[in-house]
Curated annotation (Swiss-Prot):
Positions of region (Homooligomerization): 259-310
Signal peptide: 1-18
Species lineage: Eukaryota, Metazoa, Chordata, Craniata, Vertebrata
Gene: APOE
Record-given protein name: Apolipoprotein E
Sequence repeat ranges, renumbered to this chain: 77-98, 99-120, 121-142, 143-164, 165-186, 187-208, 209-226, 227-248
Chain residue ranges for the region called Specificity for association with VLDL: 271-283
Keywords: Chylomicron, Endosome, Extracellular matrix, Glycoprotein, HDL, Heparin-binding, Lipid transport, Lipid-binding, Oxidation, Phosphoprotein, Repeat, Secreted, Signal, Transport, VLDL
Reported modifications of this chain: APOE exists as multiple glycosylated and sialylated glycoforms within cells and in plasma. The extent of glycosylation and sialylation are tissue and context specific.
One of the record's GO molecular function terms: heparin binding
Reported function: APOE is an apolipoprotein, a protein associating with lipid particles, that mainly functions in lipoprotein-mediated lipid transport between organs via the plasma and interstitial fluids. APOE is a core component of plasma lipoproteins and is involved in their production, conversion and clearance. Apolipoproteins are amphipathic molecules that interact both with lipids of the lipoprotein particle core and the aqueous environment of the plasma.
Record's subunit section: Homotetramer. May interact with ABCA1; functionally associated with ABCA1 in the biogenesis of HDLs. May interact with APP/A4 amyloid-beta peptide; the interaction is extremely stable in vitro but its physiological significance is unclear. May interact with MAPT. May interact with MAP2. In the cerebrospinal fluid, interacts with secreted SORL1. Interacts with PMEL; this allows the loading of PMEL luminal fragment on ILVs to induce fibril nucleation.
Amino acid sequence: MKVLWAALVVTLLAGCGADVEPGPEVQLGKEWATWQASQPWEQALGRFWNYLRWVQTLSEQVQEQLLSSQVTEELTALMDDTMKEVKACQSELEEQLGPVTEETKARVSKELQAAQARLGADMEEVRSRLAQYRGELQAMVGQSTEELRGRLSAHLRKMRKRLLRDAEDLQRRLAVYQAGIWEGAERSVNTLREHLGPLAEQAATVHTLVSKPLQERAEAWAQRLRGRLEKAGFPVGDRLDEVREQVQEVRAKVEEQANQVRLQAEAFQGRLKSWFEPLVQDMQQKWAELVEKVQLAVGAVPTSVPSEKQ
């Protein structure tokens, strides 16, 4: 687990330091196709991305809607939805951090807020640029707007690259911290099992620890009593039989109590097993899904992100 944790951190740092270089439009499209939108915030961001791709076509329909406020209003709604889901995901993760130091919580919160702010700034810049284009377009009614469309298209390509980079940076950070939480939870369950194991073993040996010494002491006492009674001239046969029966009754009661203790301990262990095994299995399944998702996300983002061409 520790080795995988270290590998995820190294991957996160390497992805954050990647440079952005030009490249063909089709490559960026393929990269976005590998986006693992399993979380609500990832799905919301996917809707923002798809709408932005449609706007970038600058078709006649897009041009008509850009002259009104419809495009910017739609982007605003998609952006607000995305940031709302991002904040909810961050809050949930911070709650799951559990018994870590306040310093660690503060550092994680600061890093996630910074990544979240970068993503929000990217979407805000897209919206602002389209609002600016709308004003320029309205001022050029009846004139050629080809140059204006070219500048907007180039700017949107640049913003799509930045948006993809910052989105995957946030995704990797969330994955790394979530992996640490699952590792800690699984380790805690294993520790609890290690502590409960000896309890079951002790309960299983209660019968031997209690009944055997009692039996030995009872037999020794009976022998001493027989010797004393014989020396005193008393008949000991019936009396010893009575004593033996009493000893057997005491022994049976002790054995019954020991068995009850053992059964209670076994039942307690069974309840704990039924409580924690589904949790461990669920965490192991989520861990496997997380590792696969991180590997796909990291493998889909090369050290240099190509630019786009219409």
